[in-house]
Amino acid sequence: MKKTFINREELEAIVAEFPTPFHLYDEKGIREKARAVNQAFSWNQGFKEYFAVKATPTPAILKILQEEGCGVDCSSYVELLMSHKLDFPGSEIMFSSNNTPDKEYAYACELGATINLDAFEDIEHLERAAGIPEIISCRYNPGGVFELGTDIMDNPGEAKFGMTKDQLFEAFAILKEKGAKTFGIHSFLASNTVTHLYYPELARQLFELAVEIKEKLGIWLDFINLSGGIGVNYRPDQEPNDIALISEGVRKVYEEVLTPAGLGQVKIFTELGRFMLAPHGALVTRVTHKKKTYRTYLGVDASAVNLMRPAMYGAYHHITNMTHPEGPAEVVDVVGSLCENNDKFAVNRELPHTEIGDLLVIHDTGAHGFSMGYQYNAKLRSAEILCTEEGKARQIRRAERPEDYFATLYGFDFDKDE
């Protein structure tokens, strides 16, 4: 059974003030997670966590992480702009993008962000847009499949991201010739891994590559970015990742590979998003309909526009009935109101007997939840509420209104007949 970070009485008080559906975040949990990550990697003097903004692009959340010493990993102009408006200095902004417009390279350079080049061909784009900066990173894709033991974790060879090894070496040589002085590498090989072995294996590949870069190019890397990929236990029967154990595995490989090669000062960076935020957010929704045909359907006031992952990936998110957490079980589909049959949060899920009006919590939506929202069927995006460390509920993003939906349209008078 998954635990919620809020009890029934607390949730009912919040719902009395803010109508469902909404995304709810736990400030205490977010701060504790950031501190745990920083403590786990404290053995590395230059360690920095650059939170993946794409996971939860909400200023109030980014400010919490900033206060805990995190930087930001941006992938677009607006994410860069948001980070700048929140007073993240360029040294705390990593710009990891792909198929990047020239204006975004120019803006990233203007801010002093570290650019992580996705493609060998991007050298030309970057030079044309802003010149070659002194600090530069390149993204590596080893190709093939990524395995841990006998398990295939992912297939980098089919990913659109990164450079081949030959391209990487040529890129570093060219960038050095064009004036770059400080170098780093980055790689992302698997998503949402629930194992303490992923980071150490990725680290080994990148550390050995760093040694080879030093020997063949005479370039001492300043940092190695392990990016993201550490996942969360969406299912209650999964063991959560232990970041201290994961970091210890990385440290052992660091001392085995980098230190003997004279690279014992290399900084370790991470770009965790899901691991940092997912467990500390939930989608709160109310049951509005109950329908029985060939199955039993619980209709809720949230839909895939509020949480796309189950519809898009078939992803599992645990669901807790906060109103009636116990009782005789029934097998149900939990569904939204979109005109799409994949608008389902759960399929053939066993839940306690549920009635219209019950409050449901959909777990682990703190990352890639609100951020993946959209407006199909002219649905409006929901509010975001923060449970503060003081036990208060604070709205950090209001729900969209109809006038927001029409705000960008020309030739349409929203106020007509009023």
Q: In which residue ranges do the predicted regions lie?
A:
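Active-site loop/helix belt of alpha/beta enzymes
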Residues: P142-T288, L351
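Flexible loop/turn segments at secondary-structure boundaries
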Residues: P57-A60, P101, V145-F146, S191-T195, ...
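Structured core elements
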Residues: G71, M94, T114-N116, S137-R139, ...
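Glycine-rich, aromatic-flanked loop segments that form ligand/cofactor-binding clefts
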Residues: G131-V145
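Charged (often Lys/Glu-rich) extended helix/loop segments that serve as interaction or gating elements
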Residues: L258, L263-E418
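A charged N-terminal "starter" segment
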Residues: M1-I115, F120-E134, L175-K181, I213-E215, ...
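Conserved, mostly hydrophobic/aromatic
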Residues: I30, K54, S76, A108, ...
